[in-house]
């Protein structure tokens, strides 16, 4: 099995709204954390939540952290789509897929997937309708099924694991609507005993 797995997310769009806030850790380190919701089209029909957990002002070498500075501008200016529509601030974010592990009220472990933000930059180009929220990741797939949907057409669902930078196994399931993609996984017939390691995007 590979030692380095791909797991990348790229998002461009308008700052729709956010819960970003300046905070201080118990050890006295200033940082910014919270959720930045990004509208990936001019009509804000698709909004992607991006989670920034711990963004500090400088890197280990002492250089300023441009992502911290940009998130600070978003907090200070609050130039959001909710307030200003399509004239709102635009951003470009790179990150990865991660799982938010927690215990439910019933005592069961839940691991919903989410986007973890790594770097954020101002975006000056127009926001296109297609291609503003993309991901590519290696995935160890243990199952595939076709789901019937009379309203929107049948779709496929794969379940398995993606990997973070520590190569931890992160359980995820993904929806597939592309017919060729559905055909590929149906023919591959991945199972727990005979999984499929492949790249998905």
Task: Walk through the language-model features, giving the residues of each.
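OB-fold and OB-like single-stranded nucleic-acid-recognition modules
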Residues: 1-201
